[in-house]
Amino acid sequence: MKIFKPALWKIPPIENGSETALAEKTETLKQRLHRIAGSHRDARFASSLAAEDMVITDLIAGENLNIGIFTLDTGLLHAETLNLLDRIERVYPHMQIKRFQPIREDALHYVESKGRFAFYDSVEARRECCRIRKTEPLDRAIAGADAWLTGQRREQSATRTELPFAEYDAGRGIDKYNPIFDWSEHDVWAYILANNVPYNDLYRQGFPSIGCDPCTRPVKAGEDIRAGRWWWEDKNSKECGLHK
């Protein structure tokens, strides 16, 4: 008997005639990054290693901007994500990406008191896991900085449709920027494919949005690009708490 396999999301191809529009968007993004670097003594980019984050990373490296880059190694990342980190270090040897990990005792206590996969039990349990593995390490990563950057885009989810370029992170008392906020998925991939920017191998396996291994799965063609993130929850709760 033939087993039916649903068609999965695929990396969008470069659209014909998009070169001029992409060049304009790229120039605007460069200007935004230069503005951020020039107006802050210590700006730091929180890279999730997603495709849009790799666009920003490539421009920071290419423009030699004074913007530090870090990523959150949650302890639950896919092997493909860790492999990407190694590739980034080879492609951009002059650039250091700092890794911030959860406090080991807190992560162990969560597992021992609640269970290894307790994040499937409730939104509260999942958010507590995200707090330990993402939010607390992020707070350490931007401590002392006067601005931080994200790779968030308006198109990504229902909770990001009004995302601005610049905002104030009142909870942390720091300026926050979303420099690629107005790029589309096609813009992101057109840049990556045209400039041979390294990206996570999971994208070729139907993952348009990538988080921790237990909380991410492939997405079917036509589904929301974040449908594979915390798929057991309501779409309006699908945030990890980093962007309060």
Curated annotation (Swiss-Prot):
It comes from the Bacteria. GO terms for biological process: cysteine biosynthetic process; hydrogen sulfide biosynthetic process; sulfate assimilation, phosphoadenylyl sulfate reduction by phosphoadenylyl-sulfate reductase (thioredoxin). It is found in: Cytoplasm. Disulfide bonds: none annotated. Its main location: cytoplasm. Keywords: Cytoplasm, Iron, Iron-sulfur, Metal-binding, Oxidoreductase. The active site is at 240 (nucleophile). Catalyzes the formation of sulfite from adenosine 5'-phosphosulfate (APS) using thioredoxin as an electron donor. This is Adenosine 5'-phosphosulfate reductase.
